[in-house]
Swiss-Prot record:
It comes from Uncinocarpus reesii (strain UAMH 1704). It is an enzyme of class 3 (hydrolase). It is found in: Secreted. The lineage of its organism: Eukaryota, Fungi, Dikarya, Ascomycota, Pezizomycotina. This is Leucine aminopeptidase 1. The gene is LAP1. Glycans are attached at N187.
Protein backbone atom coordinates (compact mmCIF):
# COMPACT_ATOMS: atom_id res chain seq x y z
CA UNK A 1 0.00 0.00 0.00
CA UNK A 2 2.73 2.44 0.91
CA UNK A 3 4.73 1.72 -2.27
CA UNK A 4 1.67 2.22 -4.45
CA UNK A 5 0.85 5.44 -2.67
CA UNK A 6 4.33 6.81 -3.22
CA UNK A 7 4.11 6.04 -6.93
CA UNK A 8 0.77 7.80 -7.08
CA UNK A 9 2.23 10.74 -5.23
CA UNK A 10 5.04 11.03 -7.72
CA UNK A 11 2.49 11.17 -10.51
CA UNK A 12 0.77 14.25 -9.15
CA UNK A 13 3.51 16.18 -7.41
CA UNK A 14 6.98 17.00 -8.72
CA UNK A 15 9.76 16.13 -6.30
CA UNK A 16 10.75 19.76 -5.91
CA UNK A 17 7.20 20.80 -5.09
CA UNK A 18 6.84 17.99 -2.59
CA UNK A 19 10.12 18.85 -0.94
CA UNK A 20 8.93 22.42 -0.62
CA UNK A 21 5.82 21.31 1.19
CA UNK A 22 7.61 19.05 3.64
CA UNK A 23 10.31 21.62 4.42
CA UNK A 24 8.24 23.40 7.07
CA UNK A 25 9.08 26.93 8.03
CA UNK A 26 7.41 29.71 9.94
CA UNK A 27 6.26 32.65 7.86
CA UNK A 28 4.61 35.99 8.42
CA UNK A 29 1.38 37.00 6.73
CA UNK A 30 3.09 38.59 3.75
CA UNK A 31 1.64 38.23 0.29
CA UNK A 32 3.15 35.35 -1.71
CA UNK A 33 5.43 35.98 -4.67
CA UNK A 34 3.43 36.95 -7.75
CA UNK A 35 6.08 36.95 -10.47
CA UNK A 36 4.69 33.78 -12.02
CA UNK A 37 1.04 34.58 -11.28
CA UNK A 38 0.48 31.13 -9.76
CA UNK A 39 -2.19 31.25 -7.07
CA UNK A 40 -0.78 30.57 -3.63
CA UNK A 41 -2.45 29.50 -0.40
CA UNK A 42 -1.33 30.07 3.16
CA UNK A 43 -1.57 26.85 5.16
CA UNK A 44 -0.92 26.22 8.84
CA UNK A 45 0.72 22.87 9.60
CA UNK A 46 0.92 23.39 13.36
CA UNK A 47 0.82 26.17 15.95
CA UNK A 48 2.96 28.98 14.53
CA UNK A 49 4.06 26.84 11.57
CA UNK A 50 2.75 28.22 8.27
CA UNK A 51 3.83 28.57 4.65
CA UNK A 52 2.61 29.57 1.21
CA UNK A 53 1.97 26.70 -1.23
CA UNK A 54 0.42 26.16 -4.63
CA UNK A 55 -2.79 24.20 -4.98
CA UNK A 56 -0.78 21.27 -6.36
CA UNK A 57 1.36 21.33 -3.24
CA UNK A 58 -1.73 21.32 -1.03
CA UNK A 59 -2.93 18.07 -2.59
CA UNK A 60 0.57 16.58 -2.47
CA UNK A 61 0.74 17.38 1.22
CA UNK A 62 -2.56 15.61 1.86
CA UNK A 63 -1.25 12.51 0.12
CA UNK A 64 1.94 12.57 2.13
CA UNK A 65 0.05 13.33 5.32
CA UNK A 66 -2.22 10.31 5.09
CA UNK A 67 0.02 7.68 3.55
CA UNK A 68 3.52 8.51 4.73
CA UNK A 69 3.62 10.98 7.61
CA UNK A 70 0.50 10.26 9.64
CA UNK A 71 -1.16 13.30 11.14
CA UNK A 72 0.42 15.83 8.74
CA UNK A 73 -2.68 17.97 8.12
CA UNK A 74 -3.35 21.68 7.79
CA UNK A 75 -5.68 24.64 7.99
CA UNK A 76 -5.95 26.81 4.89
CA UNK A 77 -5.79 30.29 6.43
CA UNK A 78 -5.47 32.31 3.22
CA UNK A 79 -8.64 34.25 4.03
CA UNK A 80 -7.05 35.56 7.21
CA UNK A 81 -4.09 36.85 5.25
CA UNK A 82 -6.33 38.42 2.62
CA UNK A 83 -8.21 40.27 5.35
CA UNK A 84 -5.01 41.37 7.07
CA UNK A 85 -5.47 39.58 10.38
CA UNK A 86 -4.60 36.36 12.11
CA UNK A 87 -6.58 34.29 14.55
CA UNK A 88 -5.48 35.15 18.05
CA UNK A 89 -4.96 32.45 20.61
CA UNK A 90 -8.53 32.02 21.79
CA UNK A 91 -9.01 31.02 25.39
CA UNK A 92 -10.66 27.63 25.40
CA UNK A 93 -14.19 27.62 26.79
CA UNK A 94 -14.32 25.69 30.05
CA UNK A 95 -17.34 23.41 30.30
CA UNK A 96 -18.19 20.85 32.96
CA UNK A 97 -19.87 17.83 31.40
CA UNK A 98 -22.10 15.30 33.17
CA UNK A 99 -20.35 12.57 35.14
CA UNK A 100 -22.93 9.99 34.08
CA UNK A 101 -25.51 9.39 31.38
CA UNK A 102 -29.13 9.85 32.44
CA UNK A 103 -31.52 9.27 29.56
CA UNK A 104 -31.28 5.59 28.64
CA UNK A 105 -35.02 5.13 29.18
CA UNK A 106 -35.95 7.99 26.85
CA UNK A 107 -33.40 6.98 24.23
CA UNK A 108 -34.15 3.25 24.11
CA UNK A 109 -37.15 3.54 21.74
CA UNK A 110 -35.44 6.24 19.67
CA UNK A 111 -32.32 4.17 19.18
CA UNK A 112 -34.40 1.31 17.82
CA UNK A 113 -35.68 3.65 15.10
CA UNK A 114 -32.20 4.23 13.66
CA UNK A 115 -32.19 2.61 10.23
CA UNK A 116 -29.29 1.03 8.37
CA UNK A 117 -31.57 0.98 5.33
CA UNK A 118 -31.98 4.75 5.44
CA UNK A 119 -28.25 5.27 5.72
CA UNK A 120 -27.59 2.92 2.81
CA UNK A 121 -30.23 4.54 0.61
CA UNK A 122 -28.89 8.01 1.34
CA UNK A 123 -25.28 6.97 0.80
CA UNK A 124 -26.07 5.27 -2.51
CA UNK A 125 -27.47 8.56 -3.77
CA UNK A 126 -24.78 10.71 -2.19
CA UNK A 127 -21.98 8.71 -3.81
CA UNK A 128 -23.68 8.79 -7.21
CA UNK A 129 -22.49 12.35 -7.80
CA UNK A 130 -19.31 12.27 -9.89
CA UNK A 131 -17.47 14.21 -7.22
CA UNK A 132 -18.41 16.39 -4.28
CA UNK A 133 -15.27 18.48 -4.77
CA UNK A 134 -16.03 21.88 -3.27
CA UNK A 135 -15.36 23.85 -6.47
CA UNK A 136 -17.34 21.54 -8.76
CA UNK A 137 -20.84 21.80 -10.16
CA UNK A 138 -21.64 18.33 -8.84
CA UNK A 139 -20.40 19.48 -5.44
CA UNK A 140 -23.14 22.09 -5.46
CA UNK A 141 -25.66 19.55 -6.72
CA UNK A 142 -24.81 17.08 -3.95
CA UNK A 143 -25.10 19.82 -1.34
CA UNK A 144 -28.50 20.80 -2.75
CA UNK A 145 -29.68 17.19 -2.55
CA UNK A 146 -28.43 16.92 1.04
CA UNK A 147 -30.17 20.16 2.01
CA UNK A 148 -33.41 18.73 0.64
CA UNK A 149 -32.95 15.53 2.66
CA UNK A 150 -32.44 17.50 5.87
CA UNK A 151 -35.52 19.60 5.09
CA UNK A 152 -37.50 16.41 4.43
CA UNK A 153 -36.60 15.10 7.88
CA UNK A 154 -37.87 18.34 9.40
CA UNK A 155 -41.07 18.27 7.35
CA UNK A 156 -41.79 14.62 8.14
CA UNK A 157 -41.50 15.28 11.88
CA UNK A 158 -43.61 18.44 11.84
CA UNK A 159 -40.76 20.21 13.61
CA UNK A 160 -40.78 23.41 11.57
CA UNK A 161 -43.74 24.77 13.53
CA UNK A 162 -41.55 24.61 16.63
CA UNK A 163 -38.75 26.61 15.00
CA UNK A 164 -36.58 23.77 13.74
CA UNK A 165 -34.95 24.88 10.49
CA UNK A 166 -32.17 24.22 8.04
CA UNK A 167 -30.20 26.90 6.23
CA UNK A 168 -27.37 27.28 3.77
CA UNK A 169 -24.12 28.82 4.94
CA UNK A 170 -22.77 30.25 1.71
CA UNK A 171 -19.11 30.35 0.71
CA UNK A 172 -17.32 32.09 -2.20
CA UNK A 173 -16.22 28.80 -3.81
CA UNK A 174 -19.65 27.41 -4.75
CA UNK A 175 -20.52 24.46 -2.53
CA UNK A 176 -22.32 25.71 0.58
CA UNK A 177 -22.30 24.30 4.09
CA UNK A 178 -25.55 23.28 5.79
CA UNK A 179 -26.73 24.11 9.32
CA UNK A 180 -29.83 22.54 10.89
CA UNK A 181 -30.99 24.10 14.16
CA UNK A 182 -33.18 22.56 16.86
CA UNK A 183 -33.88 25.40 19.32
CA UNK A 184 -33.77 24.72 23.04
CA UNK A 185 -34.65 26.85 26.05
CA UNK A 186 -31.28 28.62 25.89
CA UNK A 187 -28.77 29.72 23.27
CA UNK A 188 -26.16 27.37 24.68
CA UNK A 189 -25.41 25.18 21.68
CA UNK A 190 -24.30 21.61 21.09
CA UNK A 191 -22.97 20.96 17.57
CA UNK A 192 -22.72 17.66 15.70
CA UNK A 193 -20.74 17.85 12.45
CA UNK A 194 -19.56 15.96 9.38
CA UNK A 195 -18.10 17.13 6.09
CA UNK A 196 -20.02 16.67 2.87
CA UNK A 197 -17.28 17.28 0.29
CA UNK A 198 -15.10 14.62 -1.29
CA UNK A 199 -11.89 14.71 -3.28
CA UNK A 200 -9.78 12.63 -5.63
CA UNK A 201 -6.28 13.85 -4.88
CA UNK A 202 -4.86 12.71 -8.20
CA UNK A 203 -6.92 15.15 -10.32
CA UNK A 204 -9.45 16.83 -8.00
CA UNK A 205 -11.42 18.76 -10.61
CA UNK A 206 -11.64 15.86 -13.10
CA UNK A 207 -11.61 12.38 -11.58
CA UNK A 208 -14.49 10.72 -9.75
CA UNK A 209 -14.52 10.98 -5.97
CA UNK A 210 -17.36 8.86 -4.55
CA UNK A 211 -16.17 9.54 -1.01
CA UNK A 212 -18.32 6.79 0.49
CA UNK A 213 -16.35 6.63 3.71
CA UNK A 214 -14.71 10.07 3.57
CA UNK A 215 -17.06 11.50 4.51
CA UNK A 216 -20.25 10.20 2.99
CA UNK A 217 -20.45 7.78 5.90
CA UNK A 218 -20.32 10.54 8.51
CA UNK A 219 -22.74 12.66 6.50
CA UNK A 220 -25.48 10.02 6.41
CA UNK A 221 -24.71 8.86 9.96
CA UNK A 222 -25.49 12.24 11.48
CA UNK A 223 -28.40 12.73 9.06
CA UNK A 224 -30.00 9.57 10.44
CA UNK A 225 -29.31 10.66 14.02
CA UNK A 226 -30.90 14.04 13.22
CA UNK A 227 -33.99 12.37 11.77
CA UNK A 228 -34.48 10.17 14.82
CA UNK A 229 -33.71 12.95 17.31
CA UNK A 230 -36.68 14.85 15.87
CA UNK A 231 -38.95 11.96 16.85
CA UNK A 232 -38.52 13.05 20.47
CA UNK A 233 -41.42 15.30 21.45
CA UNK A 234 -39.31 17.09 24.04
CA UNK A 235 -36.49 17.79 21.59
CA UNK A 236 -38.75 18.70 18.69
CA UNK A 237 -40.88 21.06 20.78
CA UNK A 238 -37.91 22.98 22.17
CA UNK A 239 -38.11 21.71 25.76
CA UNK A 240 -34.44 20.78 26.02
CA UNK A 241 -32.17 23.06 28.01
CA UNK A 242 -29.81 23.66 25.10
CA UNK A 243 -29.99 24.28 21.37
CA UNK A 244 -28.68 21.50 19.13
CA UNK A 245 -27.21 22.07 15.67
CA UNK A 246 -26.21 19.62 12.97
CA UNK A 247 -23.58 20.86 10.51
CA UNK A 248 -22.52 19.48 7.14
CA UNK A 249 -19.35 21.31 6.13
CA UNK A 250 -18.10 22.21 2.69
CA UNK A 251 -14.43 22.16 1.70
CA UNK A 252 -12.99 20.17 4.60
CA UNK A 253 -10.55 18.50 2.22
CA UNK A 254 -9.12 21.86 1.15
CA UNK A 255 -8.00 22.83 4.65
CA UNK A 256 -11.16 22.89 6.81
CA UNK A 257 -12.43 25.93 4.93
CA UNK A 258 -16.17 25.53 5.51
CA UNK A 259 -15.98 24.81 9.22
CA UNK A 260 -13.44 27.59 9.73
CA UNK A 261 -15.83 30.07 8.12
CA UNK A 262 -18.70 28.96 10.35
CA UNK A 263 -16.84 28.97 13.65
CA UNK A 264 -15.14 32.25 12.75
CA UNK A 265 -18.60 33.75 12.29
CA UNK A 266 -19.81 32.17 15.53
CA UNK A 267 -16.85 33.69 17.36
CA UNK A 268 -17.48 37.15 15.90
CA UNK A 269 -21.16 37.05 16.85
CA UNK A 270 -20.61 35.64 20.33
CA UNK A 271 -22.24 32.25 19.84
CA UNK A 272 -22.08 30.09 22.97
CA UNK A 273 -21.00 26.67 21.70
CA UNK A 274 -20.62 24.25 24.61
CA UNK A 275 -19.62 21.14 22.67
CA UNK A 276 -18.82 20.04 19.13
CA UNK A 277 -18.56 16.41 17.96
CA UNK A 278 -17.15 15.57 14.53
CA UNK A 279 -18.04 12.35 12.68
CA UNK A 280 -15.58 11.82 9.82
CA UNK A 281 -15.31 8.26 8.40
CA UNK A 282 -17.70 5.97 10.28
CA UNK A 283 -18.06 2.86 8.11
CA UNK A 284 -14.82 0.93 7.59
CA UNK A 285 -13.91 -2.01 9.86
CA UNK A 286 -11.98 -4.38 7.57
CA UNK A 287 -8.60 -3.04 8.65
CA UNK A 288 -9.42 -3.74 12.28
CA UNK A 289 -10.80 -7.22 11.63
CA UNK A 290 -7.91 -8.23 9.36
CA UNK A 291 -5.53 -7.30 12.16
CA UNK A 292 -7.36 -9.71 14.44
CA UNK A 293 -8.61 -6.91 16.65
CA UNK A 294 -12.03 -6.28 18.17
CA UNK A 295 -14.41 -4.04 16.24
CA UNK A 296 -14.48 -0.67 17.99
CA UNK A 297 -14.86 3.05 17.43
CA UNK A 298 -11.82 5.29 17.61
CA UNK A 299 -11.88 8.09 20.17
CA UNK A 300 -9.37 10.77 19.20
CA UNK A 301 -7.24 11.99 22.10
CA UNK A 302 -5.00 14.68 20.58
CA UNK A 303 -6.04 18.28 19.90
CA UNK A 304 -9.45 17.70 21.49
CA UNK A 305 -11.21 18.83 24.67
CA UNK A 306 -10.38 16.31 27.43
CA UNK A 307 -13.63 16.79 29.36
CA UNK A 308 -15.85 16.33 26.32
CA UNK A 309 -13.82 13.32 25.25
CA UNK A 310 -14.30 11.71 28.66
CA UNK A 311 -18.05 12.25 28.40
CA UNK A 312 -18.09 10.69 24.94
CA UNK A 313 -16.48 7.58 26.42
CA UNK A 314 -19.44 7.37 28.83
CA UNK A 315 -21.86 7.74 25.92
CA UNK A 316 -20.18 4.94 23.96
CA UNK A 317 -20.26 2.64 26.97
CA UNK A 318 -23.92 3.45 27.58
CA UNK A 319 -25.36 3.45 24.06
CA UNK A 320 -23.09 1.43 21.77
CA UNK A 321 -22.72 -2.33 21.48
CA UNK A 322 -18.98 -2.20 20.80
CA UNK A 323 -16.09 -0.67 22.77
CA UNK A 324 -13.85 2.25 21.95
CA UNK A 325 -10.13 2.42 21.33
CA UNK A 326 -8.04 5.51 22.01
CA UNK A 327 -6.14 6.88 19.02
CA UNK A 328 -4.59 10.03 17.56
CA UNK A 329 -4.95 11.76 14.20
CA UNK A 330 -2.71 14.84 14.41
CA UNK A 331 -3.12 18.58 13.99
CA UNK A 332 -6.11 19.89 11.98
CA UNK A 333 -7.18 16.38 10.96
CA UNK A 334 -10.90 17.19 10.65
CA UNK A 335 -13.49 19.91 11.26
CA UNK A 336 -13.51 19.64 15.05
CA UNK A 337 -10.17 21.46 14.83
CA UNK A 338 -11.94 24.55 13.50
CA UNK A 339 -14.19 24.68 16.56
CA UNK A 340 -11.16 24.32 18.82
CA UNK A 341 -9.31 26.99 16.85
CA UNK A 342 -11.96 29.50 17.88
CA UNK A 343 -12.05 28.42 21.51
CA UNK A 344 -14.96 25.98 21.42
CA UNK A 345 -14.58 22.54 23.06
CA UNK A 346 -14.55 19.81 20.45
CA UNK A 347 -14.06 16.07 20.03
CA UNK A 348 -13.73 13.56 17.22
CA UNK A 349 -14.75 9.91 16.91
CA UNK A 350 -13.59 7.91 13.88
CA UNK A 351 -14.33 4.38 12.63
CA UNK A 352 -11.33 2.63 14.23
CA UNK A 353 -7.85 3.10 15.51
CA UNK A 354 -6.39 5.61 13.06
CA UNK A 355 -3.81 3.22 11.62
CA UNK A 356 -6.61 0.73 10.82
CA UNK A 357 -8.81 3.29 9.03
CA UNK A 358 -9.72 3.22 5.35
CA UNK A 359 -6.70 3.45 3.01
CA UNK A 360 -8.86 3.92 -0.11
CA UNK A 361 -10.01 7.43 0.71
CA UNK A 362 -9.36 10.25 -1.77
CA UNK A 363 -9.52 7.79 -4.70
CA UNK A 364 -12.14 6.24 -6.98
CA UNK A 365 -12.02 3.16 -4.73
CA UNK A 366 -13.67 4.80 -1.70
CA UNK A 367 -16.95 3.00 -2.36
CA UNK A 368 -19.91 1.61 -0.43
CA UNK A 369 -18.81 -1.98 -0.93
CA UNK A 370 -16.02 -1.47 1.60
CA UNK A 371 -18.31 -0.22 4.36
CA UNK A 372 -20.25 -1.80 7.21
CA UNK A 373 -23.66 -0.30 7.91
CA UNK A 374 -23.74 -2.23 11.17
CA UNK A 375 -20.68 -0.23 12.19
CA UNK A 376 -22.23 3.02 11.02
CA UNK A 377 -25.25 2.19 13.16
CA UNK A 378 -22.96 2.19 16.20
CA UNK A 379 -21.79 5.70 15.31
CA UNK A 380 -25.41 6.77 14.86
CA UNK A 381 -26.29 5.41 18.31
CA UNK A 382 -23.37 7.32 19.81
CA UNK A 383 -24.32 10.52 17.97
CA UNK A 384 -27.96 10.26 19.02
CA UNK A 385 -26.99 9.56 22.62
CA UNK A 386 -24.55 12.44 22.82
CA UNK A 387 -26.94 14.94 21.24
CA UNK A 388 -29.82 13.96 23.53
CA UNK A 389 -27.76 13.81 26.72
CA UNK A 390 -26.12 17.19 26.13
CA UNK A 391 -29.37 18.78 24.96
CA UNK A 392 -30.73 18.31 28.48
CA UNK A 393 -27.50 18.79 30.42
CA UNK A 394 -26.70 21.80 32.57
CA UNK A 395 -23.69 23.15 30.70
Amino acid sequence: MKHLSLLALAAVAPTTALAGVIDHQQVTFEKPPTHNQIEKFLIQLGPGESRWVTEEEKWALKLVGFYVLEGMNFFDITAESDQGFSVKSFEQTKVTYPSEIKYQKELAPLSKDLSKGNMRENLVKFTSFHTRYYKSETGVQSATWLLERVQQAIDDSGASKHGVKVEKFNHPWGQFSIIATIPGRSNKTVVVGAHQDSINLFLPSILAAPGADDDGSGTVTILEAFRVLLQSDAIREGKAANTVEFHWYSAEEAGLLGSQAIFSEYSKTGRDVKAMLQQDMTGYVEGTLRAGEVESVGVITDFVDPGLTEFIKLVIKGYCDIPFVLTKCGYACSDHASASRYGYPSAFVIESEFKRSNQKIHTTSDTIELLSFDHMLQHAKMTLGLAYELAFAEL
